[in-house]
């Protein structure tokens, strides 16, 4: 491609409304332009990268045996009502009514459509397993679209759906997709982790997220320093006691005593005013119970409640709803800053770390008073114990190997075992080998294709601009003929070299614009072309070309005859 024929709309200034690096650089590099809130036009440079991501995804999905289909973006309300998600999905669902007063939605996902297709096309277990995927535009009516294409309303997604006759088959399909995702993100050149995750609103059981590690990531990624264990913050667990220690509760050393604490409405104030170590305090949080009334959840004062773990408890109503102060006072007779387990007449569930505490402090369920020296089984019967908290840096890994570290991540892929959630709701059955109708077991597997582009930039950039991995750069090589408008020799050599490199399978941009070299170099750095070759009269006099990798600080002079092999060694396909 000739730069003179390419729309290169680079910007020197950073747009004021771009908050994160990927959004800033995609605008400055002329990859995207904003049309409206959460809606973006992909310009030629951006589209080249987007298509390369799509191609890698498509190749690996095909390699894994999935079949490509293309389903409508607009979906009839009847399917969503059948699955029960028409009302459940809420305002994220863009609802449309046609001229005949029929309700539709612009699909944010396609579980209903693919289930409808399969229940009409697949009749027998002999047609299984089957896996279908598409790469298609979705729409979610985000309240606050932000961060450019990272959290846009319209986006491109690869979504796949597997169908099996039994759990063993579903596990095989799931494992095949997991392996395909590992290959995809490795080929994309990303530093990522596959982490255990909660299924959330999708439903079902068994789930992994694929997180690109980046300081700007919205998600906390937890991984062990001594093993392959990794999970997101919602799913991550830790051993209840440090490595090498037996998880036993120390014997009581203190008597229970009631203390006036008139101004201690928070853990921090209690610790500051009364000298109690924070790890000897308890937070009592009250939530709505699944059978009505309130349920008390207890975590250590220096820990935070994990709301996903709490919501998954059978005793807790979903979605998780914290009790209001009015509800708490009506049930207990005290406010939120004075709650604790002693004489508390409601169901209690305590975190595993709380179960190991002795001589601790907590509210007395009387405004302005706390109990100190509380001990389980002496002062309060030991209630139900569960994993309720977020892990913290340095916690022992749940597999007993190493400790937990926390990094930031950007979710770019997610795989789920859905089970029969949709097939049961929508009566998608097949005949098994006994001739009995059984519901299909489903898996679903998504990759945010547009988000991958932004995540790659968040992980690969410097002060000069984007640093693309070779596999998804809009161009692998930039050829820069110096003074080509004056030197016929440089111009002819550049044209010949361009053709040779293109014939060798490289994706090449020849910068034939009538601009100063510094402007061309700055554009190429901003755009992120990973390899640059400069052709000049002085170099040709010595049968040399100037090479500079995007991450290199210095240039390298390469013999003209050896350039092809030199580039082949450096460019990762």
Curated annotation (Swiss-Prot):
Catalytic reaction list: tRNA(Pro) + L-proline + ATP = L-prolyl-tRNA(Pro) + AMP + diphosphate
EC number(s) per entry: 6.1.1.15
UniProt cross-references to InterPro entries, sorted A to Z: aa-tRNA-synt_IIb (IPR002314), aa-tRNA-synth_II (IPR006195), aa-tRNA-synth_II/BPL/LPL (IPR045864), Anticodon-bd (IPR004154), Anticodon-bd_dom_sf (IPR036621), Pro-tRNA-ligase_IIa (IPR002316), Pro-tRNA-synth_IIa_bac-type (IPR004500), Pro-tRNA-Synthase_IIa_type1 (IPR023717)
Compartments, as annotated in UniProt: Cytoplasm
Pfam families assigned to the protein according to its UniProt record, in alphabetical order: HGTP_anticodon, tRNA-synt_2b, tRNA_edit
Gene3D superfamilies: Anticodon-binding domain, Bira Bifunctional Protein, Domain 2, YbaK/aminoacyl-tRNA synthetase-associated domain
Keyword Aminoacyl-tRNA synthetase in record: yes
GO function terms (MF aspect): aminoacyl-tRNA deacylase activity; ATP binding; proline-tRNA ligase activity
Gene Ontology CC annotation, any one: cytosol
Recorded family membership: Belongs to the class-II aminoacyl-tRNA synthetase family. ProS type 1 subfamily.
The protein's role, per its UniProt record: Catalyzes the attachment of proline to tRNA(Pro) in a two-step reaction: proline is first activated by ATP to form Pro-AMP and then transferred to the acceptor end of tRNA(Pro). As ProRS can inadvertently accommodate and process non-cognate amino acids such as alanine and cysteine, to avoid such errors it has two additional distinct editing activities against alanine. One activity is designated as 'pretransfer' editing and involves the tRNA(Pro)-independent hydrolysis of activated Ala-AMP.
Subunit text: Homodimer.
Domain comment as written in the entry: Consists of three domains: the N-terminal catalytic domain, the editing domain and the C-terminal anticodon-binding domain.
Name of the protein in question: Proline--tRNA ligase
Organism for this UniProt entry: Chromohalobacter salexigens (strain ATCC BAA-138 / DSM 3043 / CIP 106854 / NCIMB 13768 / 1H11)
Gene: proS
